[in-house]
């Protein structure tokens, strides 16, 4: 086994001293996630990965070295939900230097980028050609595409088009032994035709590297499907329902997904807007006092005729269920109009900066913890009621904890639901309330068969693995085939 000094010396030889760090402050900064303090394991060494103008980099060399000496290794993008925390120490690869947008093909409507490319930058490049990713996120430049594919990236457009992983046409992946493979459309790169579809001559293996938490290989390139769309084609609406209308909300969402006319529906509750309304960011005089559920809805329409048809159908469904149109939220918390309120506009208008709901909430509360999972829309009312009851029992159903829901309705008649709780990480009593609540959520969620998206599955106890049955054994066998020394993000799968 090599000493730490020997490991550092070899890494310095591969990438240069400037790109290798063992600074304790760097370790803490790179280790933490959005749930600061939840994962305390630190990397032994941080390596900054950078590519040159021709796309050359040293990832394969680093992996060969790490594999030979059985050194754990994780790849990190921006901040994340915990999957890039180095549970076993070892090497942490900072992928942000592999950030090139390699090709935008307007004719074939795809984009090829390096695995560390900012999703924000990909959108910017696409918009120069009247294109965008069908699923666009609401975040700033820190989020990278490789991480989004590795751990179920989400964004607006899920109601019509699905996850970021559903946009993947091809991948270039570097395996634990340093071998580079191209999958899907990228297997056709270099031919006369070039990339054009995910299906090739062999079985589709893209799924091995999507939602895999970096445990099967390091994503070095991605090829993503884009759609023709200008920002002016996206039209924003918000309908509000009372707390006792959740059953009607559930039925409306199912009907809208079935009709396939809505581009996106974002489901939130009043807790998300409590502090923004108190600060005057949103005028609460223009929002019903009894409004509890907010359905932020986006329509994609290329012309007035298409918009009229889709808008009429959407309004009929919401209004017949008792919903109330609230332009105040649509104008100030959604889309291009929100840019007029500050410098933090599309595509991260509703989260980042002083004009975002999250910035406003944090000023009055503290750090937040979040659970993220998927389940069928027809269980929305049951799951919301269970979460509210758990939060009340734990003493966190109040403005000080802002126990909000922030969820995406998907094309699979499902909801990608995030339960938030804001808390004081330096108050043991508050942390105790948080842990009790998270345990209750884990129990009732596991019992019903949710699909967890964050934090990593290994934090969710034995029930999800038991439900997978022999499939989990097969996945472990595949992992052992491509990474026999289990150096890639150990602990993520086993």
Question: Where is each model-derived feature located?
Answer:
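Anion (oxyanion) recognition and catalysis
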Residues: 67, 127, 257, 319, ...
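FAD-binding subdomain of flavoenzyme oxidoreductases
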Residues: 102-104, 115, 120, 124-252
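Activity-critical C-terminal alpha-helical subdomain
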Residues: 349-353, 454-494
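Helix C-cap/helix->beta junction micro-motif
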Residues: 68-69, 129, 390, 448
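C-terminal substrate-recognition/cap domain of FAD-linked oxidoreductases
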Residues: 28-30, 240, 245-437, 455-458
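Residue-level detector of anion-binding/catalytic polar loops
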Residues: 70-72, 132, 262, 324, ...
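General beta-strand structural signal in soluble alpha/beta enzymes
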Residues: 20-24, 48-49, 73-77, 83, ...
């Amino acid at each position: 086994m090599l000493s730490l000094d020997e490991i550092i010396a070899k890494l310095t030889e591969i990438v240069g001293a400037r790109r290798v760090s063992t600074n304790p402050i760097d370790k803490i900064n790179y280790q933490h996630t959005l749930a600061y303090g939840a994962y305390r394991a630190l990397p032994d060494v941080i390596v900054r990965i950078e590519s040159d103008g021709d796309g050359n980099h040293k990832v394969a060399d680093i992996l060969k070295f790490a594999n030979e000496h059985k050194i754990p290794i994780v790849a990190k993008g921006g901040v994340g939900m915990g999957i890039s925390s180095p549970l076993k120490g070892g090497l942490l690869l900072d992928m942000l230097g592999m950030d090139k947008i390699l090709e935008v093909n307007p004719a074939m409507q795809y984009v090829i980028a390096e695995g560390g490319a900012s999703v924000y930058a990909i959108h910017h490049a696409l918009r120069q050609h009247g294109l965008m990713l069908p699923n666009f996120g609401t975040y700033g430049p820190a989020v990278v595409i490789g991480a989004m594919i590795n751990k179920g990236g989400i964004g607006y457009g899920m109601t019509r088009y699905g996850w970021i992983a559903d946009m993947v046409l091809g991948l270039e992946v570097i395996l634990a032994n340093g071998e580079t493979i191209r999958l899907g459309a990228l297997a056709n790169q270099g031919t006369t035709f070039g990339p054009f579809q995910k299906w090739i001559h062999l079985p589709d293996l893209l799924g091995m590297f999507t939602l895999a938490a970096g445990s099967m290989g390091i994503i070095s390139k991605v090829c993503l499907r884009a759609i023709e769309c200008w920002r002016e084609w996206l039209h924003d609406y918000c309908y509000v329902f009372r707390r006792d209308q959740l059953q009607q909300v559930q039925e409306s969402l199912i009907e809208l997904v079935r009709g396939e006319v809505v581009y996106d529906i974002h489901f939130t509750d009043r807790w998300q807007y409590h502090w923004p309304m108190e600060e005057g960011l949103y005028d609460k005089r223009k929002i019903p006092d009894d409004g509890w559920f907010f359905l932020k809805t986006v329509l994609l329409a290329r012309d007035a005729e298409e918009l009229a048809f889709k808008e009429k159908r959407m309004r009929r469904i919401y209004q017949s269920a008792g919903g109330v149109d609230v332009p105040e939220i649509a104008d100030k918390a959604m889309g291009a109009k929100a840019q007029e309120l500050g410098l933090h506009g599309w595509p991260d208008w509703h989260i980042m900066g002083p004009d975002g709901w999250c910035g406003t909430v944090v000023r009055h509360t503290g750090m937040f913890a979040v659970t993220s999972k998927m389940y069928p829309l027809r269980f929305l009312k049951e799951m919301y009621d269970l979460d509210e009851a758990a939060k009340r029992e734990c003493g966190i159903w109040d403005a000080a904890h802002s126990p909000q829901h922030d969820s995406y309705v998907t094309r699979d008649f499902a909801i990608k639901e995030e339960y938030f709780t804001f808390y004081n990480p330096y108050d043991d009593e508050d942390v105790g309330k948080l842990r009790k609540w998270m345990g209750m959520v884990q129990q009732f969620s596991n019992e019903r068969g949710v699909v967890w998206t964050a934090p990593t599955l290994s934090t969710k106890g034995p029930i999800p693995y038991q439900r997978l049955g022999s499939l989990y054994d097969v996945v472990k066998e595949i992992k052992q085939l491509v990474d026999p020394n289990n150096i890639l993000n150990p602990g993520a799968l086993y």
